[in-house]
Amino acid sequence: MSILPIIKGEYKKDYNLKHLTWFKVGGNAEIFFKPFDSADLKSFLIQNNKKLPITTFGSGSNIIIRDGGIEGVVIKLGKNFNNIEFLDNHLIVGSSCLNYNLAKFCQANAISGFEFLVGIPGTIGGGVVMNAGAYGSAFQDIIVQIEALDFLGNFLTFTNKEIGFKYRGNNLPKDLILLKAIFKANKGDSQNILLKMNKINTTRSSTQPIKERTGGSTFKNPVGCKSWELIDKAGLRGYRIGGASMSELHCNFMINNGNATAKDLEDLGNFVRQKVFEDSGVELNWEIKRIGKYV
């Protein structure tokens, strides 16, 4: 391990990440770093100069941390990166702000177009990276620009076009840490916005296992079909490996039934991919990220 950069924030060594993920599984971070602010993060990156490997971490909602843990430095942006500012008909939002909190802010301030965020777990930063979407809307529809640091500490901006949004992804460089996202704010009716959000919440609670230890949609939808339909057709609704299973309620959701390991979850996902391909000839691609050392 190289000498760690001098910082204002906080380092924790051999830090268990399990409690930070929605699945509640996984190993330790060799070094866990919460920067004090963007200047602190920039200073760390400049001093590090890519010597130590870096992994960024959001709310842990769509990720499997493998049981062998993560080498190098895991960076998690905290409360100093979750601000929401309404300025000149734009919203300037910190990357660690929860999607749900931005949706509630917009409802309270009669800003329309953000209702779908109430049904998407995770942070704004993760939503941009994944081009997260639901109920007919996605991040690509509302983003104007993002601000970021690369792993050398250079400050960069990208417009919506430069981000290169695609289905559940983008064409941004991989060595970026998102700081802020800027959105166009369109005025709407607060009561109508609330009605839309309530409808989304009702639909989610009746069709998704939101009270379980899950990571959201496991696989991206292939062109022209739904992953859950292919999984169901292959007879895998409720299928179980160890402490992990495909949800009975929505079979594109994996669940930790209480004693699953990260290996159980990843093995289950790969088994489902194999069986769906054998049954339908369609290759499912992971939507949930898997990071760390597989053991």
Curated annotation (Swiss-Prot):
Stretch forming the signal peptide: none
Organism for this UniProt entry: Rickettsia typhi (strain ATCC VR-144 / Wilmington)
Compartmental location: Cytoplasm
E.C. numbers: 1.3.1.98
Top-rank taxon, per record: Bacteria
Catalytic activity: UDP-N-acetyl-alpha-D-muramate + NADP(+) = UDP-N-acetyl-3-O-(1-carboxyvinyl)-alpha-D-glucosamine + NADPH + H(+)
Protein name: UDP-N-acetylenolpyruvoylglucosamine reductase
Enzyme class: oxidoreductase
GO MF term set: FAD binding; UDP-N-acetylmuramate dehydrogenase activity
GO BP, sorted A to Z: cell division; cell wall organization; peptidoglycan biosynthetic process; regulation of cell shape
Gene responsible for this protein: murB
Family indicated by similarity: Belongs to the MurB family.
